[in-house]
Amino acid sequence: MHKLLPTLLFLLVTLALRAQQKVIPLYPGAAPGSENWTWSETESDKNIYHSNAIFNISKPTLTVYLPDSSHAPTGMAVIVCPGGGFHSLSIMQEGYGVVGWLQSKGITAFLLKYRLMHIRGTDPYQQENEDRTRKAADTERAVVADMAIADGRQALAYVRTHAADYGIDPKRIGIIGFSAGGVISLATAYEATPENRPDFIGFVYGGMTPATIQAPVPADAPPLFIAAASDDQYDLQLMAVKVYTKWVTAKRVAEMHIYAKGGHGFGLRKQQLPSDSWTDRFLEFLTQQGLLKN
């Protein structure tokens, strides 16, 4: 029983924090392009991995997590994009855990629930596995990925427009994404406007859309932090190297950490591996760039 106590405590704290947060719809009405989506957002751990996941998001939102009272606010904000293959959100280690960690550092965090592919049953992971061999799923995923990227841009615009409401410096607003969420965070650097341009990007074992792969790095591309593991099951460490090469070739600021072990989806999971320390490296990077000011 004592081995379960840390997990139970984490879940209780998470539930308490979630009950206190402000949830903001990203669009005043139905999100553009998904006006006819009728399915309801669901959060459940009843899946093949017994892992808490959110799926069937048709109404994208931002949830605000203000800095902990134990730490002076830094005036910086980070939008957090969990991964999940555009089928679900891996909400614990790449969502709730990440925003809680940022709060503890005096950073205002915004959890982005972006639009996802329609899950026809009750297990998003099972459908994701089945969709790997379903050709129509590739087309659907590409369409939804573009919608999710639009949600990321909309989230950045919201935070910058309302920066004063949250005590945020409008020049220190960034975005971090994990896996599919990294597709979103990286893409926001492209075709950005003054309202939705991120001031920094976290790209953690992320991917790229074909359009992002082909596009030149913008002349004003923000500082980029990259983390991945060499034993990533989806070989996204190779994507990390490609993104890093594109950034430095364009003479833009980038820092990359490729860990020998860690696998895909390490997030905030502690494995007694060097990849556990990526969070420290990320904060150091932000400090060196003059973005994180204690």
Regions from the PLM with identified roles:
Residues 199-258:
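The feature captures the conserved acid-bearing segment of alpha/beta-hydrolase catalytic domains
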Residues 1-22:
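Bacterial Sec-dependent N-terminal signal peptides
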Residues 144-220:
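Primarily recognizes the serine-hydrolase "nucleophile elbow" in alpha/beta-hydrolase
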